[in-house]
Regions:
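Short, well-structured beta-strand
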Residues: 83-189
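Secretory pathway targeting signatures of secreted, lumenal, and periplasmic proteins
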Residues: 1-95, 125-127
Length: 189
């Protein structure tokens, strides 16, 4: 997979980028495994490695390029279980990037006009099922069309937050605000 280039985005302290390839998967799983060993949770280590491998396959299937997440301790900061994935998106021939996003979601897409151009945003919440019952996932999508007339191409970022059904709603909203703030730093180069 080639590197995505032509943009920059600022992540908070303690966040890392992982490419969605074999090297990135190994690096991520090693990080998760190391953390679980530090916590003395070998059973959880095995479950999380299996879950991470399954999730990595899904990311590969959707042609996700990279994920960003908080994976390092930073004194004075509390990290929420938020991750952000990025992938290239090309609309079907004869369509624009914005119109092509309809193939990704049934949620309402809202357009925000900004100094760098329109930002397309949509969100949805999915309740947990089966083994994940009681754990919801709230996701927010952000679309950035290439800054060219009637562009069919652009980038899609998806921020995802997993949380228990009884989580403090203020913390959930704070995580979504953090994702919105991160996306506000996006710039084409």
């Amino acid at each position: 997979m080639t590197a995505l280039s032509g943009f920059r985005i600022m992540m908070p302290p303690g966040w890392s980028q992982y490419r969605v390839d074999e090297e990135g998967r190994k690096r991520y799983i090693a990080k998760v495994s190391s953390r679980m060993k530090q916590l003395g949770q070998p059973e959880l280590d095995v479950r999380l490695r299996m879950l991470a491998t399954t999730q990595w396959r899904r990311l590969e299937q959707t042609r996700t390029h990279s994920i960003y997440l908080a994976d390092r301790e930073v004194e004075g900061l509390t990290h929420l279980p938020l991750s952000i994935a990025v992938r290239q998106q090309v609309a079907p021939s004869g369509s624009t990037f914005a119109a092509g996003l309809r193939t990704l979601t049934t949620a309402e897409i809202v357009t925000f006009d900004t100094a760098i151009g329109p930002i397309l945003r949509w969100e949805w919440t999915k309740p947990g099922e089966g083994e994940l019952e009681g754990i919801a996932v709230r996701s927010v999508g952000y679309g950035f069309a290439l800054p060219e007339e009637n562009s069919r191409r652009g980038l899609v970022f998806t921020a995802s937050l997993s949380y228990p059904d009884d989580a403090d709603p203020l913390l959930v909203e704070a995580a979504i605000e953090l994702a919105d703030s991160i996306m506000e730093t996006f710039r084409w180069q």
